[in-house]
């Protein structure tokens, strides 16, 4: 049974920026399920895509791994020999809780948990890279360099799975999808106070891009084959494949 997210249930006089501290880590599974539509579907599909695209003797990266849900999904599906997973998160409480969580599952696939800024991590010999609702927390000026480094570190035929909250350039559509997401949170038991306070806490730390911006960035990095494979309201996931003839 997960601890219920009540972080923003009472009025907070001095509301600071949202951060992945011990308090958030304690309620994160409940928070993510009640806040991100389609999250479980995305996690399941990450495992299936890893099974299809992982290459023998390669590395798989979970960048911004939080509690290791995507890491465990990949590990559970892998059958290729010699694969290693590197799971990275900047939050010390997240990494420690992920370590405890992953240790509860038996697997022959080794996982290296790394506490670091994903912008400082070398991507090498990769067949699968996952950015699952992570890029939106990266400094916008650093995003292109990160995507380029991922492309360069992927083997030909490797994939990037990029899940994000999207901003839409058509204003009426964007407004509608925002409202539908708020309805989703209300239906999951969040009060207007909780929704408002969390939105304000996230304002300075989570900056979303449009689908067009993501597509352009991926194209510029060298991903010729890329598109949206999942969407629910203003949340979704993209897949980008490095051509088998790419260097």
Curated annotation (Swiss-Prot):
Gene3D superfamilies from the entry? Vaccinia Virus protein VP39
Give an example GO biological process: tRNA wobble uridine modification
Q: Where does S-adenosyl-L-methionine bind?
A: 39, 64-66, 117-118, 132, 199
Is the keyword Transferase assigned to this protein? yes
What reaction gets catalysed by this protein? prephenate + S-adenosyl-L-methionine = carboxy-S-adenosyl-L-methionine + 3-phenylpyruvate + H2O
The record, for SUPFAM superfamilies, names: S-adenosyl-L-methionine-dependent methyltransferases
Which Pfam families does the record associate with it?
A: Methyltransf_25 (PF13649)
Enzyme type, top EC level: transferase
UniProt KW keywords: S-adenosyl-L-methionine, Transferase
Its Gene Ontology molecular function terms? carboxyl- or carbamoyltransferase activity; S-adenosyl-L-methionine binding
Query: What's its EC?
Result: 2.1.3.-
The entry describes its oligomerization and partners as:
Homodimer.
What the record says about family reads:
Belongs to the class I-like SAM-binding methyltransferase superfamily. Cx-SAM synthase family.
The family database entries (PANTHER family) matched by this protein are listed as: CARBOXY-S-ADENOSYL-L-METHIONINE SYNTHASE (PTHR43861:SF2), TRANS-ACONITATE 2-METHYLTRANSFERASE-RELATED (PTHR43861)
Described by its record, this protein's role is as follows: Catalyzes the conversion of S-adenosyl-L-methionine (SAM) to carboxy-S-adenosyl-L-methionine (Cx-SAM).
Protein name per the record: Carboxy-S-adenosyl-L-methionine synthase
Q: Quote the gene name from the UniProt entry.
A: cmoA
